[in-house]
Amino acid sequence: MIARTKIICTIGPATNTPEMLEKLLDAGMNVARLNFSHGTHESHGRTIAILKELREKRQVPLAIMLDTKGPEIRLGQVESPIKVQPGDRLTLVSKEILGSKESGVTLYPSCVFPYVRERAPVLIDDGYIQAVVVNAQEHMVEIEFQNSGEIKSNKSLSIKDIDVALPFMTEKDIADLKFGVEQELDLIAASFVRCNEDIDSMRKVLESFGRPNMPIIAKIENHLGVQNFQEIARAADGIMIARGDLGIELSIVEVPGLQKFMARASRETGRFCITATQMLESMIRNPLPTRAEVSDVANAIYDGTSAVMLSGETALGAHPVHAVKTMRSIIQETEKTFDYHAFFQLNDKNSALKVSPYLEAIGFSGIQIAEKASAKAIIVYTQTGGSPMFLSKYRPYLPIIAVTPNRNVYYRLAVEWGVYPMLTLESNRTVWRHQACVYGVEKGILSNYDKILVFSRGAGMQDTNNLTLTTVHDVLSPSLDEIVP
């Protein structure tokens, strides 16, 4: 059974070996996320090499995502996890040290220290550990813990009511982007996006490195990102609803409503949407998710999210492969009761991004024709990825087989809802239609006498403008030997 909603897996110590990565791929991974808040270029480079070798060997559109560290406040390295209890105190310092309970822990960036005030609430590791500032000095802050937990290396830290304007991109981010371009990665997830200018500035950096069209995913995780959401969505290629930091920066009870708003608005704007953070969190330790987690994943799918993301579950959890299999099972079961027709009508009515009235008419009419004719799939040839991305926003019941000669587009489409990318060297319409039908049959999407709708481009036309309703049998009747001399 196919799954239209895509799965993103964060790669970490639990999964960064060839054997584990292949198991994740077999379980349903579509995108491998590398979190550049952790690790080095050397360690990420090893993982990237394994992923590239794996996707070539298996001939699959596995995308690789670079997630930037961004302008966040974060703890430094600790010698070993520091266990804390209510009432315990810990010193945070500006100088770089290997942290311990006795010597304290480094806090990055050092520019935040002058802005910290006593009695300010502190949340560590997405709010799992809570503390309060009891002593604030120029290069040192002392905090007192309000609950028990373990302080680990590089964990996120949030200080309430701190008014400091951090730069959107740090020197590390720029170096990481350069590395990502050199490694020919497929997607960039930009952390803590506040406005469309942040996206524009990142595009300029990517352009300076020779990759101006590298897709950028805007992570929405603070109040400015929410406030400026519409302009950010138009500037970015996709949206990630980063619920962890969002639930710290705003009230946690606001997150479900914001999730629904952003999923809907992303779709209407023609942008893919990723729902992230704590989706199957208990599976970091346990072999089964909670009922609430299953409902959380299902509701994200009902909201129309393009992809769901696993973080700690696959990066450092005890059951990474089973977590992916569980996620895929939830997707497949939920999609049985997904109201495709309602989404189709709603998206046409509320579409906020009219790419062109002509293309809108072709796409909308084509999906209607395909559904009324009981077609089993849509096949579309694309060089830029625009046509399948455009069709995906309507959330059609029909799988979209996207045929492309562009390797970057092939991998980039891995994150799009309902899109199944296929790489070809052919521009001959008869040949690529034949290849797409063979691909569909091999993947279990199509059978011999199924009807299909083919989107293609007429001679001299820039946009997709040709719709053909045919059958798999008619396309495959002449063999490739007969088609190609």
From Swiss-Prot:
InterPro entries in alphabetical order: Pyr_Knase, Pyrv/PenolPyrv_kinase-like_dom, Pyrv_kinase-like_dom_sf, Pyrv_Knase-like_insert_dom_sf, Pyrv_Knase_brl, Pyrv_Knase_C, Pyrv_Knase_C_sf, Pyrv_Knase_insert_dom_sf
Cofactor: Mg(2+); K(+)
Claim: RNA-binding is one of the keywords in the record: no
Residue numbers binding ATP: 35-38, 74, 155
Record: residues binding substrate: 33, 244-245, 277
Site positions (Transition state stabilizer): 219
Transmembrane segments: none
Binding-site residues, K(+): 35, 37, 67-68
GO molecular function, one term: ATP binding
A GO term from the CC aspect: cytoplasm
EC number: 2.7.1.40
Keywords: ATP-binding, Glycolysis, Kinase, Magnesium, Metal-binding, Nucleotide-binding, Potassium, Pyruvate, Transferase
GO BP term, pick one: glycolytic process
The keyword Kinase is annotated on this UniProt entry: yes
Residues reported to bind Mg(2+): 221, 245
Catalytic reaction list: pyruvate + ATP = phosphoenolpyruvate + ADP + H(+)
Pathway: Carbohydrate degradation; glycolysis; pyruvate from D-glyceraldehyde 3-phosphate: step 5/5
Subunit structure: Homotetramer.
Family: Belongs to the pyruvate kinase family.
Name listed for the protein in its UniProt record: Pyruvate kinase
Organism placement in taxonomy: Bacteria, Pseudomonadati, Chlamydiota, Chlamydiia, Chlamydiales
Gene: pyk
